[in-house]
């Protein structure tokens, strides 16, 4: 498809993929091609390069100039699907497909979740054969529209994690690399893990073994 200034461009990225606590959030941002330059002006960059305060401020600015959509996939849903032999890439692709079908872009740029870019590209292309598809590793660093999606996803996950903290207390960042998260998991007695925890994660298996 030949893209012009009026073409609708969609960026997609996720937050919380590797987390053991909390949801996986997929974010989509849709803008006309001619308006993408405004993302530079409001300070859009990969969400990992921004602290929480800056992400929140920029997220509000993105929402004023673009259409956006978030898909929240709770921990217990991830577990249910994985227990039915649906892997994390497939779970995430389902969420991306939902965003694409809702937003109907002319072109879609995605931070590739597969080790093989071509294989992932073909999966996304099947969703809409008439759509231009770009799937690259580190697309969130290369394309501003994907950076914007990464900010939207990360801010929503931050919000979801805060809701979790209000109910369950200090859970850290939710990632296995966070000592505070591991310490929280170790306080859970008799392996009665609440639904905010991804029980199918290797982290939980290791903790369960260590407390036996």
Curated annotation (Swiss-Prot):
Its EC number is 3.1.26.4. One of its GO terms (cellular component) is ribonuclease H2 complex. Its cofactor is Mn(2+); Mg(2+). GO terms for molecular function: manganese ion binding; RNA binding; RNA-DNA hybrid ribonuclease activity. InterPro entries: RNase_H2_suA (IPR004649), RNase_HII/HIII (IPR001352), RNase_HII/HIII_dom (IPR024567), RNase_HII_arc (IPR020787), RNase_HII_hlx-loop-hlx_cap_dom (IPR023160), RNaseH-like_sf (IPR012337), RNaseH_sf (IPR036397). It is an enzyme of class 3 (hydrolase). PROSITE patterns: RNASE_H_2. It catalyses: Endonucleolytic cleavage to 5'-phosphomonoester. It is found in: Cytoplasm. A divalent metal cation binds at residues 13-14, 111. CDD domains: RNase_HII_archaea_like. It comes from the Archaea. One of its GO terms (biological process) is DNA replication, removal of RNA primer. It holds the Pfam family RNase_HII. Residues 7-212 form the RNase H type-2 domain. SUPFAM superfamilies: Ribonuclease H-like. The keyword Phosphoprotein does not apply. Its main location: cytoplasm. Keywords: Cytoplasm, Endonuclease, Hydrolase, Manganese, Metal-binding, Nuclease. Disulfide bonds: none annotated. Gene3D superfamilies: Ribonuclease H-like superfamily/Ribonuclease H, Ribonuclease hii. Domain 2. Endonuclease that specifically degrades the RNA of RNA-DNA hybrids. Belongs to the RNase HII family. This is Ribonuclease HII. It comes from Methanosphaera stadtmanae (strain ATCC 43021 / DSM 3091 / JCM 11832 / MCB-3).
């Amino acid at each position: 498809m030949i893209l012009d200034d009026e073409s609708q461009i969609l960026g997609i990225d996720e937050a919380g993929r590797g987390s053991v606590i909390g949801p996986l959030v997929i974010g989509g941002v849709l803008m006309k091609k001619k308006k993408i330059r405004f993302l530079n002006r409001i300070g859009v960059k990969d969400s990992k390069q921004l602290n929480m305060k800056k992400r929140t401020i920029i997220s509000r600015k993105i929402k004023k100039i673009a259409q956006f959509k978030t898909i929240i996939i709770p921990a217990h849903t991830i577990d249910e699907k994985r227990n039915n032999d649906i892997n994390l890439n497939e779970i995430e692709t389902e969420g991306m497909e939902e965003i694409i079908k809702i937003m109907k872009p002319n072109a879609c740029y995605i931070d590739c979740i597969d080790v093989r870019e071509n294989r992932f590209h073909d999966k996304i292309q099947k969703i809409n054969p008439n759509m231009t598809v770009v799937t690259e590793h580190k697309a969130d660093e290369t394309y501003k529209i994907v950076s914007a999606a990464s900010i939207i996803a990360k801010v929503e996950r931050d919000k979801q994690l805060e809701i979790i903290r209000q109910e369950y207390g200090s859970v850290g960042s939710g990632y296995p690399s966070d000592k505070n998260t591991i310490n929280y998991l170790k306080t859970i007695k008799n392996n009665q893990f609440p639904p905010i925890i991804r029980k199918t994660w290797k982290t939980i298996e290791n903790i369960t073994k260590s407390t036996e």
